[in-house]
UniProtKB/Swiss-Prot annotation:
Encoding gene per record: carA
Organism: Yersinia pestis
Function: Small subunit of the glutamine-dependent carbamoyl phosphate synthetase (CPSase). CPSase catalyzes the formation of carbamoyl phosphate from the ammonia moiety of glutamine, carbonate, and phosphate donated by ATP, constituting the first step of 2 biosynthetic pathways, one leading to arginine and/or urea and the other to pyrimidine nucleotides. The small subunit (glutamine amidotransferase) binds and cleaves glutamine to supply the large subunit with the substrate ammonia.
Positions of region (CPSase): 1-189
Family assignment from sequence similarity: Belongs to the CarA family.
Biochemical pathway: Amino-acid biosynthesis; L-arginine biosynthesis; carbamoyl phosphate from bicarbonate: step 1/1; Pyrimidine metabolism; UMP biosynthesis via de novo pathway; (S)-dihydroorotate from bicarbonate: step 1/3
InterPro entries, per the entry: Anth_synth/Amidotransfase (IPR050472), CarbamoylP_synth_ssu (IPR006274), CarbamoylP_synth_ssu_N (IPR002474), CarbP_synth_ssu_N_sf (IPR036480), Class_I_gatase-like (IPR029062), CPSase_GATase1 (IPR035686), GATASE (IPR017926)
List of catalytic residues: C269, H353, E355
Record protein name field: Carbamoyl phosphate synthase small chain
Top EC class for this record: ligase
Chain positions recorded as L-glutamine binding sites: S47, G241, G243, L270, Q273, N311, G313, F314
Known EC number: 6.3.5.5
Assembly description: Composed of two chains; the small (or glutamine) chain promotes the hydrolysis of glutamine to ammonia, which is used by the large (or ammonia) chain to synthesize carbamoyl phosphate. Tetramer of heterodimers (alpha,beta)4.
GO terms for MF: ATP binding; carbamoyl-phosphate synthase (glutamine-hydrolyzing) activity; glutaminase activity
Pfam families in the cross-refs: CPSase_sm_chain, GATase
Amino acid sequence: MIKSALLVLEDGTQFHGRAIGAEGTAVGEVVFNTSMTGYQEILTDPSYSRQIVTLTYPHIGNVGTNASDEESSAVHAQGLVIRDLPLIASNYRNEEGLSEYLKRHNIVAIADIDTRKLTRLLREKGAQNGCIIVGELSDAALALEKAKAFPGLKGMDLAKEVTTKEMYQWLQGSWTLEGDLPAAKQPEDLPFHVVAYDYGVKRNILRMLVDRGCRLTVVPAQTPAEDVLKLNPDGIFLSNGPGDPEPCDYAITAIKRFLETDIPVFGICLGHQLLALASGAKTVKMKFGHHGGNHPVKDLDASCVMITAQNHGFAVDETSLPSNLRTTHVSLFDGSLQGLHRTDKAAFSFQGHPEASPGPHDAAPLFDHFIELIEAYRASSVSLNCSNSHK
C-alpha cells in the first residue's frame, strides 16, 4: 500500500511525496549530495549522522543493495530524500531492494518530490533543519515544530556517538573486479602498524591503508594518547566523522600529544579539522557544505586539479592558520581550504575523501604520501637506534 509522506523545512516550506522507508519521523539537518551513484555507501557513512540526505540524481535504487557496499555496520543518515525509486533493481550483486533495506534499518524516507527545487533552496538559503513525517500527515504543524526544535550541528559532538566501543584489528584490503571482498591478510604480510582513530571511519579508508601495507589497530574516539603510544605505531590516522570538530576536546588533546612526537599523522575530513584545531587554527560552519563526488580541488604543490569526493559541513578557516601550517589544497568551487601540511612535523590532512566510495580516486596518492612519511620515520628510528647502540 502506498503511503504519503511530508518533508517540512524550518522555514515552513513543504514537500509532499510518497513514503519509501519506515513509518515515523526523521529530524535533522537537510543537505544535498550530487553523487550519481553510491547511495548505499552514503547512507552507511557515519559522517551523515543527524542529517537528512537529499540525492540530486533523479533515479536512486537502480542497483539495489548488498552487504559488501556498506561503509559501516549501520545506516547513519537520519533520513533520505529522492526524486524517483525504480521499480526494478538491476544488478547481479543485488540482495535487497532499497525500500526494503530502508525499512529493515528503520530509516524514514520520501520520494516523488521536486529535488531540484529543494536543492536550489538549500543552496540559496543554506542547509536547513527539517522533518520527514509519515503517518501523521494531517499535522504539518507538528513536523514544523520538530524541525525548528532540532538544535543544529553547530556545537554537536557526534564522533563519540558513532565510534567503535572496543579496539579492533583490520586486515582486509579493497574489493576487486575479479571477485568480491578479499579475505583478511596475515599480519606478518603487512609491514606498517598504523593506529586509526575511529571518529566515524569508513571501511574503504581502512581497506586502502591495508592495500598499502598497513596493519591497522582501530581505536575508539576517546582513547587517550598515552594508550596509543604504548602500541608503538608507525603512523597515526585520524578518520572522518560527523558533527562539529570544536567540541571534540578529547581528540584535540590527544593529537597535540602526538604532535610532540615524530610519528607521522594523517587526517581526513573531521580528522583534518581536528589536526588544524590541535595546531592552533579555527574551524567554521559552512553555508551548505560540500557533499558529492564531482568537486574540483587544486593541489598547490603539484599545480594540478583533482576531482574529489566531499562530505563536510564544517571547514578550516584559512585566515586562522598559524605559521607552522601551510595550505596544500583549495576548492575550485568556493576557494575553501582543502588540505594542510605541518611545516615542522610529519603531519598532514585533507578535507575531502581520497578513498571516495562513492566518487573518483584522484586524491588516492595522499595515502601513498602517508606511507612515504612512515617509511622515513622508521628509517630515522633505525638510524637513531644504531647510533645509540654504538655509544
